[in-house]
Amino acid sequence: MKVNTIWRGKRNFISECPSGFEVKMDATENYGGDGQGLTPMELILVGVAGCIGIDVTMLLGKNLENITKIDIQTEGSRREEMPTCFTEIKTTFIVEGEIDAQRFWKAIRLGHKKYCAVSASLKPEITYNLILNGKGIRENAS
C-alpha cells in the first residue's frame, strides 16, 4: 500500500489514498498549524476504531440483524515528553439491540488478535469495553 502526501503550506498536508479518497491533515495552532484538518494522532485513533469496527461487523455477520446501533469511542493517552506517542488506547463499543454479549466479545477479541492490522501495527496495548443496551458487560474469561 502506498499513499502520496502533498504539502499545502505551513503544517497542512493532503494525502491521496489508493482507495481514491483524500485525507486533509493539519497541526493544531500550538504546533504551528491552522487546525484545518485531522491531526495525524487523530487519524491513528480513527484507524483503530474503523479497523476493529469493520472486523467486528464482518465477524458478526448475520448476528447484526438485530443490532440497531454500534458506536465506537476510542481514546488515547499520550506521553508528556517528546515524542508524545500513545501509551494506551481504550476502545469502547456502545451497542444497542439483541445479541449475546459474549458473542460480541468474541468478535472483538478475534478482530483484535487476528484481523485488525491497524492495532497490530501499534506499540501500546489497546483495551476494549462493551456497553450493550446501556449496561457495561465484562468479557467472560473462557
Identify the meaning behind each predicted range.
Residues 1-46, 57-142:
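Extended beta-strand/beta-hairpin segments
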Residues 48-51:
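Alpha-helical metal-binding/catalytic segments enriched in His/Glu/Asp
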